[in-house]
């Protein structure tokens, strides 16, 4: 049923060459969506590998590269998506996380974080939502950040940008629900980064002062976040709209 409904529908995922983006692309391909993934210039090989992983699902797929701080990238994403079918799902997964003391944050860094985390999410949604409205069905999913809800040191620009995504989610959800498009925000907790030694599960990170209490005594993994995103993209999820869904094992319970 899902694969038939999703035929010729395109899921666009930004910042999706690996980790949560890759896991989500695989699950959406399983549901029959054609897949377009966007990546920055540093992850091209990972993007190619992700596309290779999608081959077994017999769907159309492609990737594009570009810096979301350069807003021309939005047009590149839209044009590439249209070549695969009708843009129907947008997962705004790309994001910058720059650490700096509040009083030392350079305004250029502030603007870059806002451009990538907020402006690009807005502009991608604006560019693609027209096609969702025309078919009276679509999904916009913003990937938020736990820091927007609990705060964080040395990340004022990141915290502010992720909080803005919650507001953007609510605005889109109210404006487009009568036209068949829902918008939700998924907020991962501490997720294992298999590419980085720094975030390997260890006593150090479990005791880190900026790590919330991990009630399950472990980090999450990208597949667990991707499962939530993929379920929101099902036809059966029409009644879930304007929500902020936390995936953190119970470490933060609003």
Model-derived segments and their meaning:
Residues 17-18:
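Conserved glycine-rich cofactor-binding loop
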Residues 99, 178, 185, 189-214, ...:
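A glycine/serine/threonine-rich, flexible loop-to-helix segment
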Residues 125, 161, 169:
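Active-site helix of classical SDR
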Residues 130, 174-178, 238:
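Alpha-helical segment proximal to the catalytic Tyr-Lys
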Residues 145:
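Residue(s) in the substrate-gating loop at a strand-loop-helix junction
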Residues 177, 182, 240-242, 248:
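Short, small/polar-rich loop/turn modules that mediate ligand/substrate recognition or access, typified
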């Amino acid at each position: 049923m899902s694969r038939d409904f999703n035929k010729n529908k395109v899921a666009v995922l930004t910042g999706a060459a690996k980790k949560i983006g890759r896991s989500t692309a695989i699950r959406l391909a399983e549901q029959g969506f054609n897949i377009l993934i966007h990546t920055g210039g540093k992850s091209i090989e990972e993007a190619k590998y992700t596309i290779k992983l999608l081959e077994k699902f017999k769907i159309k797929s492609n990737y594009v590269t570009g810096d979301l701080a350069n807003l021309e990238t939005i047009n590149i994403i839209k044009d590439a998506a249209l070549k695969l079918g009708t843009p129907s799902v947008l997962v705004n997964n790309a994001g910058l996380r720059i650490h700096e003391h509040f009083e030392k944050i350079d305004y250029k860094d502030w603007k870059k974080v806002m451009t990538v985390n907020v402006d690009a999410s807005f502009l991608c949604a604006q560019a693609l939502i027209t096609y969702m409205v025309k078919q009276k069905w679509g999904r916009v999913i913003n990937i938020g950040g736990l820091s927007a809800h609990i705060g964080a040191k040395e990340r004022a620009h990141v915290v502010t940008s992720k909080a803005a995504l919650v507001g953007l989610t609510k605005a889109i959800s109210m404006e487009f629900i009568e036209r068949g498009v829902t918008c939700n925000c998924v907020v991962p907790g501490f997720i294992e980064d298999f590419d980085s030694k720094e975030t390997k599960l260890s006593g150090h990170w479990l005791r880190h002062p900026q790590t919330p209490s991990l009630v399950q005594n472990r980090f999450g993994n990208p597949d667990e976040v991707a499962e939530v995103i993929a379920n929101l993209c099902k036809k059966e999820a029409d009644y879930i709209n304007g929500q902020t869904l936390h995936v953190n094992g119970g470490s933060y319970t609003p």
